[in-house]
Amino acid sequence: IVTGLVGSEMCIRDRLTVLITPNSFADTLLISGTIYTADDANTKVEAVVIKDGRFTFVGDLAAAQSKAGQDHKHLALGAATAYPGFIEGHGHLSSLGEAITNLDLNGVDSYQTIVGMVADAAAKASPGQVIKGRGWHQSKWSKEPSVTVDGFPTHRSLSEVSPNNPVFLGHANGHTALVNQAAMDALNLTYNTPTPDGGIIVKDGKGDPTGILHENAVDLAYPLIALSTDSAKTAILAAQDHAFRWGITNFHDAGAGSTDIEAQRALDASGDLKLRIYTMVSAQDDVLTDYWLARPPVIAGDDSRLTIRSFKAVMDGALGSRTAWLHQPYTDDPGTSGVQTFDENRLVDIMNRSNAHGWQINTHAIGDKANTVVLDAIDKATLTQRDHRSRIEHSQHLLPSDIGRFSKLGVIASIQAIHMSSDRPWAIDRLGIERIKSGAYVWRDLLDAGVHIANGTDVPVEPINPIANFYASVARKTLKGLPDDGYEIGQKLSRHETLKSMTLWNAYAAFEEAEVGSISVGKRADMTVTDQNLMTVDENKILATKPVMTVIGGEIVYQAMSVSYTHLRAHETRNY
């Protein structure tokens, strides 16, 4: 008997929480509705049957009911639509958790507003307490600060409103930070502090630090912002909850340090980790890298959600700070071609040593020169003697001649479509129209060349919102719907390609396509449900779509929809 739930939304959620906890399920769960499998045939089905955390049937409703037998719970989706669980293909897990509790500077349209936010925080903070924030981007401000050096603000205004509290404000790109005088005093950062390799300490005309740190120079501020293991655990759990609300079932954590890894392993051991995590060990830490290279990867089993089987190196910076490494100088700053942040010989060495235990090597490269150098390293190393699935994280700006090399060398292009929506309006200033047209965000060219792609958001550089990422992939517009026809529309992805790029292709990029990524018999029962059908809704309505249910291993970990269901048992019918 199908019973609709009534009452306030909170009452609905409270009651559903009681009824749909794993212990209240029959051993078998049947879910019916519009379901896209994202398998090789782009199949759409009516129902799935889940038992012991895996799909045991995928197909039409009548056959599903027969397969489920007389003792099962039936969850009907109604007007909602289901897909394989969305996989975040590239993000920063603990940084997301921190961003939730720190000053959120995303979307703030002026430096003066940021100064005001810091002033408010300083008024509430205890003396010496570090004020942290993230998300500012000078190219997105409506007006330029009154004082700038190299196009960036200085610490002066922050130091005036927060003289007794160190301030650390991370750039949206994660490659630049702004600190105030109290922070520099705590760090003993002065005019004669040596610039680290692969980093930049921006200084004014007198030689004094302005508070802006680029690339490896950001590490100088690490003592101010380093998390304890307990703090990292808190951040990861906050990020996990946030991810569930956006329909994320799996998360590729791009560059975890020792503290993050320790926290992840502790949460996994305690059972508090529900999100599936694919961890990339930070190759920026030589000691950590050498430790893990000498050991086999950690692969999640039935009682685990954590896999550690890859490394992440960082070859260059970001376009916004003009630290992405280019073959030719920046169009709007001919005095620089960006920054190399990792030694290519060290990268080749890591790649060669990775063969002993089958580690995957993933390397951040945004600029075309950085991408060329990483491809060269893969070509020099012995990786291609095995199924290495090396990834270039971002693969954002490429020489046309390098596109075919991705396919030839078996390299995965790990893109973040949402970066195109956010950055394309001003990226043309950095690169000029010719480089934009020939090599920027060239997803279609990569696919046509036979390159495997993965797709993520780079959260918290961008919000984790997979709906916005889907829209960016298929529309190639800003989130305001501009321009009307989209940017370089020949590079668009289809909706089926986009769905796969967020599910099956991301699973492939983590060697997990046999376990997750599509709704297929035998795979883990991970699903994301949205209130609208992403595959058919008008393009201009995609961004209004909301995730309403997240299922991991057959367990509903997030629910924001009213559902109808029945519980069928032999010789017994119950109303709920």
Q: Locations of the language-model features?
A:
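Single conserved hydrophobic/aromatic residue that forms the stacking wall/gate
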Residues: 1-14, 565-568, 572-576
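Divalent metal-binding segments
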Residues: 25-31, 36, 40-294, 309, ...
